[in-house]
Swiss-Prot record:
HAMAP family: CobT. This is Nicotinate-nucleotide--dimethylbenzimidazole phosphoribosyltransferase. It is an enzyme of class 2 (transferase). InterPro entries: Nict_dMeBzImd_PRibTrfase, Nict_dMeBzImd_PRibTrfase_bact, Nict_dMeBzImd_PRibTrfase_N, Nict_dMeBzImd_PRibTrfase_sf. Keywords: Cobalamin biosynthesis, Glycosyltransferase, Transferase. It comes from Dechloromonas aromatica (strain RCB). Signal peptide: none annotated. The keyword Transferase applies.
Amino acid sequence: MHSFEISIPDSGLETALQNKIDRKTKPLGALGLLEKTAKKIGLVQQTLTPQLNNPQMLVFAGDHGAAKAGVSAYPQDVTWQMVENFLAGGAAINVFARQNGLGLSVVDAGVAHDFGQRTGLIDAKVAAGTANYIEQAAMTPAQCAQAIQNGAAIVRQLAAKGCNVVGFGEMGIGNTASASLLTHCLTGLPLAECVGRGTGLDDAGLARKQDLLEQALIRYRNAGGNNDAGAVLAEFGGFEIATMVGAMLAAAEAKMVLLIDGFIVGSAALIASRLAPALLDYCVFCHRSAEAGHRTQLLAMGAEPLLDLGLRLGEGTGAALAYPLVQSAVSFLNEMASFESAGVSDKE
């Protein structure tokens, strides 16, 4: 697997950051998770006065061979149709990114459609969708490696343009099924507790999805498959998930703040953090999704999400919605008065 130089942020500033937070005109801990977020960002940037510069949202899109087997309520064509919707500015992520001042790019990591050259679209296509993992590995090791390299290159270009905070989103019919398999393999949670309704499967559809995923697992185990993060990514992942893994690793290497969305983005973060555990020190977990298995993902990563809105859309919507809270964490640290500067008496 690839080599990324990801170091745990130097904790030398931690006491000074905590003291700065504690001297603000408020009771200790009164800003809750915003205080932890402010401290995390200060440590990532190694400063008492962090800044969020050129914030960008990346939406990674890819098709899944297993979608044709019936793991989703929607036809595979919806992937490319939604990419067109993103490019036209009409999706939920477009609305929230515009509202909150986030730049937005769509990454074609492996959609089964030819988009040509388009403004706002990054061509990082490994292939026109993965293979059907119910019958064979979703991708070859070489394809998986290529996707990771592609993602890293995209983020390095953003870093060169002064971006120090990046949000992750995705689109791919069938990718909740893929994320369910990855979550099961990496956390040990029973598959049934990792499999949800995705885009809205009825009871029969949910049972069929679970049965198909059990078949995929049996095939993999019978072939001697293990739970190594890189191996399960190639076996069950999507090109959008693998490309996202590379992007996350490069973002942490560049000491950027990573805005982690929901269940599918969470599966990429789970993989990336198994490959480089220090990555978690750079992640802000934006929300707890309504999708089955996301709670276990968050527990496995020791994550405290900022929001719990019952979201299950994907696209990076939870990350975009949480971004103003991240801004608020930085703003209170930089702008709020201390007891001393405001002439306010602290408690006895």
